Amino acid sequence: MPRHSLRQIALFWSVNVARLVLAATFIFSGFVKAADPMGMFHKLSAYFAHWGYTFPLDSLILRGMVVCLAAVEFVLGLQFLLGMRMRLTAWCSTLFMTAMTLLTIYIYRYEPVPDCGCFGDAYVLSNGATLAKNVVLLLLCGLCLFAGRYTKRLISERNQWLTSIYTWVYVLGLCLYTLHYIPILEFTDYRNGTHWRDAWEGRFSAEAPESLSTLCFTDAQTGDDVTEQVLDSGYCFLLTMPEISTADAGNNDRINDIYDECVDNGYRFYLAVGEPWKKEDLQRWVDYTGAAYPVVSADAVQLKAMVRSNPGLLLLRDGIQIRKWSGNDLPILNDALAQQTYRNSLRGLIGLSDDNGDWRELPEKSRFFWKRPLGRLVLWYIIPLLVIMALDNLWVGSKYYRRYTQRRRLRRQQNAQATPAPEMDQQEEAPAEENQ
């Protein structure tokens, strides 16, 4: 086999393996950012705080940066996966990874944050591991840039725009949904079913992670430690406000209704504000909302991880996390019709049985992938994408079939014109014999 053939084969396999590695990395990185944008929001906020810039939790600028970052990474990953617009994709990814590599060099040298957050809270890498990863990815981007002609495209050039638009719509829709509500996928240690009290008491397990051992709730008025009361047996609603100065008070009526129901039924209800907090901010909230519930303070970083919302609502039973809600999705309890509906009643919210006071256990995780939140998110994207690719292959196949039939018809016509008819030859020979 000639040397150039071996070289081409080696380049083909090297470039396509690099393309798939880049695709997997960019898709995973963009997906986890889109599935939990507020997690990346807090990472970027920590970066800017190190450089002397502070952003409130309701900053649209920082949220826009997170959405753009997630969307760009996800779209680049898809373009690598399908081999679309490889030269443009390779150039964009090379510039992107160059900037990220320079940033991680700075992070590795000065350590402004404990981890870079490239994969959010889904998979935490050390700063050294992140730097090594980015260097490898930058080299792979360079390989795709200088030998991109050896990549194999999985969708026709004519229909690339449709796949790109669909991907942009999907990732932007996922970002906006999870920004408005809480993330569909929970990457933090504060997922439903977590045993807060066991972790606080030092009994660590898969359901009681060690990161919760530092939980501490302090009475805002007296300064006493009230963690024992918050994690005590029975039901406890925890209204989390990592940053009370920017907390959205649009749903204060729903919050007050839930508090009134808790008082009537003997359930605990606390407002947990992030430290440090100012008395004037708390007083402004009380004056505006008419809040009468007790206030405790806690670490703002932990409150941000509990619920990706400001405010957010948590429900604990015997120190076990049961449910959580975004401030934009709080239940309505003051409507007469809603009170008649079990799901919108307080009994339905806390998980009590409809006919008696027995506790309904949390539903077990389904063994079917498509019934899990991750499975539904993946299928919502994969199934339409496969339909688009199947229709594209049908279009390409029909085009080649038409060309094949046209060439076959033309070849038959050419053969018919080139081959003389036998009857005509005999008629030409007959007059020649008569003349002789």
Predicted regions and their residues:
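Hydrophobic alpha-helical segments
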Residues: 18-19, 25, 37-147
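N-terminal "domain-start" segment that seeds a small globular fold
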Residues: 177-229
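Short active-site neighborhood of thiol/selenol oxidoreductases, capturing the structured segment around
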Residues: 227-247
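Juxtamembrane interface at the cytosolic side of transmembrane helices
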Residues: 378-427
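Short, internal strand/loop/helix patches
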Residues: 287-310
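Cytosolic-side transmembrane helix boundary signature
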Residues: 135-167
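Internal/C-terminal transmembrane anchor helices
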Residues: 156-185
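A short, hydrophobic beta-strand/beta-hairpin element that forms part of a small beta-sheet core
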Residues: 311-325
